[in-house]
Amino acid sequence: MKLKNIKIEERMEHYNVNGLSIALFEEGQIRGTVNYGLLEVNSDRKVNDDSIFSACSISKFLTGIIAIKLLEEGHLDLDENVNERLVTWKVPENEYTKNKKVTLRNLLSHQSGIKDPEGSFLELNSDIGFPSMVELLEGKSHYCKVPIEVQFEPESEFHYSDAGYCILQQLIEDVTKKQFYQVVNEFIFEPLGMKNSQLNTTMSEVDRDNFSCGHNKNGELVDGKHPIYPYPAASGLWTTSLDLAELVLELMNAVKGKSKLGISESLAKEMITPQRGKSWTGLGVFLEGSEKELEITSLGWGVGFQCMMVAHPHLEKGAVIMTNAELGVHQLEGIIGEIYKSLLS
C-alpha cells in the first residue's frame, strides 16, 4: 500500500486535524511510517513514530487476539456457554437463553443477544473514578445504570456491543486469575515488542510526553486532554501506529502459519471468517469482500480521536491510520476515508 494523489497536510488543514500517524505494511513487514502535525494544538510537540493515540474501539481487535490466544491454550472454548467459566459474574439466564447460550464466538462477533443500554459506556468521569466490571455488568455504576442481560436469542441478531466486550474482559480475568492489563502485557505487548502500548488502567503511572491530546472537529482541545474509557477490553488501548501495525501483522502472519504468539493457522483463519451467516463480522474484526479480495477492518471513534486499521491478509498488505481529531462523521467520510481511498488507488 502506498499513498497516492493526496496532499495530507492540505487535507489536515481542511478538516482541522492537528496530528496524524500512518503505518504501512506489506509482505509480512512494516514498510514505513509517515507522521504529520502536532500532538497538542498550539504546542511544539510533533507527532513521531513513538506518538501514542487512543485506539478507542480498535481495542476490541486486541481483545479478539487475546481471546484466540487463550482459546489456543485451552483456557477458553469457542462455543461453550461462557457461564461455565465465568466466576465473578454470570450472564443472567432468561427466556432468550433457553435454546442458545452466550458464547465466546457470539460475544466476539457482536451476536450474543446483548444490546448496550442507551447513554452507557461514556468516557471516564474523574470525580467518580473507575468502576469494577461487576459493577458495570450489574448496572450499579454511573457508566451503565441498567443490568446487562440477553435481550434477543443469541446469534439471531447483530448488535455492536461494548457490554459484550466487558463480559469478555471479566471472562479473561476469571480464567487467568489476573487483571486484564496484566494478561495483555504478558500475552501480547511483551512478545510482540509493543513497547509504546498500554491500557488506560495504568495511565496514571506514565509520563504523558508521548501521548497525544484529543481534539474536536474544530481542532480545539477536548476537556481533560486525554479522554479515558474505563472498559479496557472494549476501548482502553493507547498505542502508536507502529505498535498497532505489529498486532495486525501478527494476525496476517498467523493466517500463514507464522504466528509469534503461537496462534494456529486454523484459529487465525476462523477470526477472519464470517460468523453465523453475517458476512461482515468475524471474531473481533469486521470483514468486506471474500477470498483473495478479503479486507479486514477495525475502527476506533471516541472523544477527541478517530482511527482505522485495514488489512488484506491474502494480498499481504495493510495500513494503520491514527488521528487526534473527532470529526463528528464516520471515519470513511473524513480524512481517514480520503487516506484509505488513496491507499487503494
Regions found by a protein language model. Give the residues of each.
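Well-ordered alpha-helical segments within folded domains of soluble proteins
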Residues: 63-64, 164-169, 245-246
